[in-house]
């Protein structure tokens, strides 16, 4: 067992930061059910773009992105439409940990057709590089069917 996974139980067991990071990194699920549901809708949308529409990184356009409201409705989370960024951040963390392009790059504001303000602070995401991240997402064949 790696040394940093060993800890003593002195009354109250407190996991070290390294143990928490290890567990989070190798977790197969999202931190919240909401993030998992959103991620699964984004995975469905990714498959739709690649399989049904036969899009490539060169042919995808902003009109193919999934507006936050539609994303939340499809996940039966309509009440999150205005605050969905927090959960999309968890999706970004999962993608970053799994070393795949950010699925959350496919989710956009309906009016502007670009991601919301929180996109820039999400793991592995940069608003300045957003379109390249979308293209990498569309090209990726490593995503699971479901999370």
Residue ranges of each PLM-predicted region?
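Intrinsically disordered, charged low-complexity linkers and terminal tails
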Residues: 1-14, 83-84, 98-100
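Basic, amphipathic alpha-helix used for nucleic-acid engagement in HTH/winged-helix/SANT-Myb modules
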Residues: 4-31
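Nucleic acid-binding interface residues in structured DNA/RNA-binding domains
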Residues: 23-48, 60-147
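Short acidic/glycine-rich loop or secondary-structure boundary segments that cap or lie
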Residues: 51
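Intrinsically disordered, low-complexity domain-flanking/linker segments in eukaryotic proteins
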Residues: 54-58
């Amino acid at each position: 067992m790696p040394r940093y996974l060993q800890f003593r139980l002195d009354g109250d067991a407190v996991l070290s930061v390294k143990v928490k990071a290890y567990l989070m990194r190798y977790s197969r699920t999202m931190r919240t059910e909401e993030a998992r549901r959103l991620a699964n809708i984004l995975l469905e949308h990714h498959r739709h773009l690649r399989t049904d529409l036969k899009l490539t990184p060169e042919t995808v356009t902003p009109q193919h992105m999934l507006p936050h409201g539609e994303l939340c409705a499809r996940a039966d989370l309509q009440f999150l439409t205005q605050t969905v960024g927090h959960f999309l951040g968890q999706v970004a963390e999962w993608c970053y940990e799994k070393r795949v392009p950010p699925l959350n790059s496919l989710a956009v504001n309906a009016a502007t057709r670009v991601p919301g303000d929180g996109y820039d602070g999400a793991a592995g995401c940069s608003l300045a590089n957003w379109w390249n991240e979308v293209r990498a997402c569309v090209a990726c064949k490593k995503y699971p069917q479901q999370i």
